[in-house]
């Protein structure tokens, strides 16, 4: 479009930064013998509906998959006119090693990237342990440094926390909290 081809990986870098926030969450479970077990909660880039499909594809057989686990997905990209600056404005930076040459960059165009983080668990307690490790960092936003075309701070804003209770089968069937 407009004669110039470019790809700065800006959306990809924002998704990677978001996933990095949640990729080392662990919970502790205590068994009947009073032994404490640390469990790393796996994270994948996938819609929550694909949890089971991804597990089956990886193993080749239909099995119960390890819970809790998390996934995140990009759900929308919306132009944000409230943050718009003059897009005809250029920013100049010196070429590394040569102060007589300048690189010019156009002003960034503001978009809001909506991402949904889903937590699947079979025990309410496990879900609460994961959520309580996330919520204190968002007041309601957490700022992350992104090394995009130029390094900048990206606010990650917590908009909503909700629970979904899924049952499969009758009263004795499998139950999942998402």
Where are these regions (language model features)?
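Small/polar-rich, solvent-exposed N-terminal microdomains that initiate assembly or binding
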Residues: 1-90
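A short linear-motif detector with a strong N-terminal bias
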Residues: 48-52, 93-99, 159-164
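Residue-level detector of functional hotspots within protein domains
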Residues: 56-63, 97-105, 130
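Oligomerization/assembly interface segments of phage tail-like spikes and tubes
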Residues: 68-76, 107-123, 132-134, 175-178
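Acidic-leaning, charged glycine-interspersed low-complexity segments
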Residues: 107-110, 129-131, 135-178
């Amino acid at each position: 479009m407009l004669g110039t081809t470019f790809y700065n990986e800006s959306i990809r870098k924002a998704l990677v930064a978001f996933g990095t926030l949640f990729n080392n969450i662990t919970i502790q479970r205590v068994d009947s013998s009073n032994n404490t077990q640390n469990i790393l909660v796996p994270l994948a880039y996938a819609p929550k509906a694909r949890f089971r499909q991804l597990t089956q594809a990886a193993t080749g057989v239909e099995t119960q998959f390890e819970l809790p686990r998390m996934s995140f997905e990009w759900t929308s990209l919306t132009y944000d006119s409230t943050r718009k600056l003059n897009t005809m404005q250029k920013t100049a930076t010196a070429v590394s090693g040569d102060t007589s040459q300048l690189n010019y960059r156009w002003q960034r165009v503001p978009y809001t990237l909506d991402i949904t983080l889903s937590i699947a668990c079979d025990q309410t307690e496990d879900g609460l342990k994961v959520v309580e490790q996330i919520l204190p960092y968002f007041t309601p936003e957490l700022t992350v440094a992104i090394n995009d075309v130029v390094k900048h701070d990206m606010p990650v804003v917590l908009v909503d926390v909700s629970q979904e209770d899924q049952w499969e089968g009758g009263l004795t069937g499998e139950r999942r909290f998402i």
